[in-house]
Amino acid sequence: MNDAPKHPLIERILNLELAMFLSVPVLQKAGCQEHPEEFKRTRRAQFLTWSEKTLASYQEDLLQAEAEGRNLMTHKYARMDGLIPKLEDNPLIDRIVEIEYAWQKGMFHRYPRLMGGARPLASAEDSPFQTSFETYLSGELETYSSQTLAALFQDMTQALAEGRSMTEDLYTHLVRSYGYASLEEAEEAAAGNGPIQG
């Protein structure tokens, strides 16, 4: 697949997100705020799995929030920490979380060493020191518009029909950005060097 046409759109999204991310209040600060290039690396890997339609819709979400003086990153982390009520009650959120949870679980089974630094899976594993994948994802999805959620769900439905995991695609992009040829190579390297943090 040729991802080149998506790159300018992704970079615009990353710049919008990073500006919001770096403005998140200190009490909600994430460790990667000290390393913005790592934030962009991880987010870029995620956005490379999205269609241009979904990317364009999310960019519009960011631009609209910016115009209205809303910081979607602040809202996401506030939801993760239970500081504000639910932002969005779209039924697609639960369906997306269910699919991505299964994909993420599959990554833990297939690449346990590589995934050793990843968030715990279930919200039941949340603690004051660590937020689970499930809680993090739900908090992020609640900041998306209905249009973006619908477009993302369409991407995921297509991936399922093709027998693909968008989560595996994400991690493939991520390990390649670190110089590995494949997930298998990164898994082997993780045995000696430790997992990629994510």
Model-derived features with residue positions:
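Polar/charged low-complexity regulatory segments
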Residues: 2-33, 83-84, 90-124, 176-179
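A cross-kingdom feature marking solvent-exposed beta-strand/loop segments within repeated
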Residues: 26-49, 60-61, 72-73, 132-141, ...
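Short, structured motif recognition centered on aromatic/hydrophobic residues
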Residues: 47-63, 96, 141-144, 148-156
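ADP-ribosyltransferase catalytic core
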Residues: 60-70, 155-159, 163-164
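Surface-exposed, interaction-prone regions used to assemble/regulate multi-protein complexes
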Residues: 64, 75, 83, 114, ...
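Short amphipathic alpha-helical linker/capping segments at the junctions of internal repeats
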Residues: 69-84, 166-179
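Conserved binding-pocket/active-site segment within a compact domain
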Residues: 109-161
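Alpha-helical oligomerization segments
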Residues: 150, 154-198
